[in-house]
């Protein structure tokens, strides 16, 4: 592949024209509010059955939003083969491939070391291990194995009880291997944490519309974060990144995933089917086809064994897990730790105050380790309707037992 082809390939996720900062994107009947400045033209799910098209207001003139790639898509996009992708060392410092003077400016893309100071982002809460924690974990395992109760004996063959410890440890290794770096946004030029927040909120709306599994949602967000950590993306392409990640996650997790035509219909022509396919393939190649991130649901199911799969605790914990998707402070945190914290906090909210040795064994964490992260999740619930609007509305339905409203009111009552 010649240099010109590589340059054309790189322009797919980076638009040639600079964005005009005086543009204001307006959505009709949309829950996504796009304010002044640089914001991607997200298509709200509420609009998919409407004839009204969103408009781009520039000064006093209105013009329709069209595809950001124009008619020259085939000339502007080409693929690199597997060898070239490996030669680029995709797991190194993120780059924007299309710049001629990249080598001279590569130092400016280096992620800062230590505590990140970009915006309000802090390093995610990582559990600290003390001798007391390790002793409590060993004691819990010894007690459970010596005197198992009937509730502790797994009879469901689908849970593969004979290999349960090995599977659990393997998933823990995957969660560390496939976790995105917490400070990746420092390498981006046109997008920020606000853009990511809007994108994830839109992904949740699409998940609700297609009734997708929670596993699909979590995997999609993981793919988005990992992709953005190794590829500089323009603002106009960020929604295509989200759409591609959700399409991949659906194929991996769903029994009957929506078709690519369903996804193209959701964005109402902003991106064509061919563009989505090409973006999907490019994302998979850049991530080295490694999409086996375990997600929190498997860990949550294991912890639930400590309470005989109590439905109320699990439902509330599922909501608290999804809340962490919206805040950048949780990026890079071990997902088993997020699942354990969500379960611990849901127990506290429902009046189950004891974190027993059984909980320690199945979660792998002590209550002392979980409390700091639980406090951070509580902070996210103070202004829940604004912090995670789509998730809040999703879990305010009767079929979800209105756990979002319950959690919001509980936090307000204790602070």
Swiss-Prot record:
SUPFAM superfamilies per UniProt: Cyclin-like
Biased composition (Low complexity): 57-71
Keywords: Cell cycle, Cell division, Cyclin, Mitosis, Phosphoprotein
Span list, region Disordered: 54-74, 86-118
InterPro entries, per the entry: Cyclin, Cyclin-like_dom, Cyclin-like_sf, Cyclin_C-dom, Cyclin_N, Cyclins_cyclin-box
Residue numbers carrying Phosphoserine: 96
One Pfam family linked to the record: Cyclin_N
GO cellular component assignments: cyclin-dependent protein kinase holoenzyme complex; cytoplasm; microtubule organizing center; nucleus
Gene3D superfamilies recorded: Cyclin-like (1.10.472.10)
Gene Ontology biological-process entries: cell division; DNA recombination; G1/S transition of mitotic cell cycle; positive regulation of G1/S transition of mitotic cell cycle; positive regulation of proteasomal ubiquitin-dependent protein catabolic process; regulation of G1/S transition of mitotic cell cycle
Domain of life: Eukaryota
Gene Ontology molecular function, alphabetical: cyclin-dependent protein serine/threonine kinase activator activity; cyclin-dependent protein serine/threonine kinase regulator activity
Protein task: Required for efficient passage of the G1/S transition.
Family per record: Belongs to the cyclin family. Cyclin G subfamily.
Protein name: G2/mitotic-specific cyclin cig1
Organism of provenance: Schizosaccharomyces pombe (strain 972 / ATCC 24843)
Gene for this chain: cig1
